[in-house]
Structure formats: structure tokens, C-alpha cells
Amino acid sequence: DGSITMQNPYWANYRNLRENRKDRYMLNAALSYDILDWLNVSGRIRIDNSHNTYTEKMYASSNVQLTEQSANGLYGVTKTMDRQVYGDALLNINKTFGDDWSLQANIGASFSDMKNDALKIRGPIADGTSGEKQGLANVFNIQNLSNSTKTVRKQEGWREQTQSIFASAEVGYKGTYYLTLTGRNDWPSQLAGPHSNAKSFFYPSVGLSVVLSQLIPNMPENLSYIKLRGSFASVGVAFERYIANPLYSWNESGLSWNTQ
């Protein structure tokens, strides 16, 4: 088939270069303080940052199907930054009332912030065929790229943040009967736009449980614990970004902004 071309494997290995480098660092910290023997506060924070650089270098004399038809080669570089930050603070309660009643509860708040930024340029090295000044073969620099529509220049990114408050409580009676209640309210950034009917959502749960092994006398030795539990819960999740707050999009082929 005359439409199929092949390259020397040695050339493909040493003159068609693709390199990916990623630098990443993470930080975790937590603090806890006992106010009373049944009451304490705690806080946590987690940071995860990464920087990624992806480069392409196609040398002159490479298959022009790989260089956007340029005889002088192709160059591309994409830089991406990702950042994730999470933090929370909690007030924790663990208390008994007499011999029969117990309470385990917590009240807290949290936030989650995620951000992505990307900058990309990729295109053929100018070879003079489009009426522009010829570039320097095998000089991998963005100023050396063609100004034609074959060169892609793109900057994009997104950011999402969710702020939350939550609480849970479990009341126990005689170590046998338990009532569990939880509730959480989220304010996600995806709902912050003008097309959203609500800025937050609440999702609760309720549960009842009985430790049957506390009620059954003469339990078999090989069966030491039986618990019956029933619960109801609702779950909330935000929809995709930009639905409530649409943005303009870039038309690469027409080199113009698409209006919403």
C-alpha cells in the first residue's frame, strides 16, 4: 500500500522524542486538643500539588505525517498544574449519662478546593511553504513555529470548591438500642452561577439498630455478637461545572470565541 510509510526504528527512538516530567509534593497535618475528658476538637489539612511538563520534538527529515507536513520538524510543549487542598475542623463528643445512656457526636466544617491550569503550544517548525519566513530546522523553540492554523495555542483550566458543614449523633441505651442521625450541607461552586435554582443542598440520614446478642440469653459460643440495623439516607452530588455558569469556548479552527 503506497499510502503507508515507515520510519527507521532507531530514528523513531532518538529523533521522535516525547518526554513527560512530573514534580509532585504532598503535605498532611493534623492537630487535636482535649477540652474535657469527653470533649475534644481536631483539625486536619491536606495539600497535593503537581506540575507536569510534556514535550514533543520531531526532528527534520521525520515522516511529515508526524510533523504537520513540515520538513523542518515539529515542537510541542504542554505545562499542567494541579492543586488539591482539603481541610476540616471537628468538635467531638463521647459521653455517658449514668449507667444506661451514651452519646457519641461530632459537629464540623470542611472545605475542598481543586484547581487545574494548562498551557499548550504545539505545531510545525516554519518551513517557508505557507508564505512565511522559514524557521531553523531542529531548533525547538516556540518562536520558531509556524503561524499557520496547524499550530495549536491553548490555555485552559478550571477550579472547583465545596464548603460544607456536617453533624452526626448516636444515642445508645443500655448498650443495646441505638439511634443514629447525620446531616450534611454542601455549598459547591458548580451551583454558584446565575442558572442555578439553589446554591446548596442538604442530605440527612437516620438509622436504628439493636444488639440482639444483648437480649438473647445463653448465646452459643461460636456466635458471640448479633446486630440488627435499619437506616435511611439521601445522598447529594453537584452536577458538572459550567452548567449553571456557562463560559465562552475557543474555536481552534476558526480562531474565534463561541458565544453562549
Where are each of the predicted segments found?
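Extracellular/periplasmic, surface-exposed regions of secreted and cell-surface proteins
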Residues: 2-58, 69-260
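Short amphipathic helix-turn modules centered on a small-residue break
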Residues: 60-62
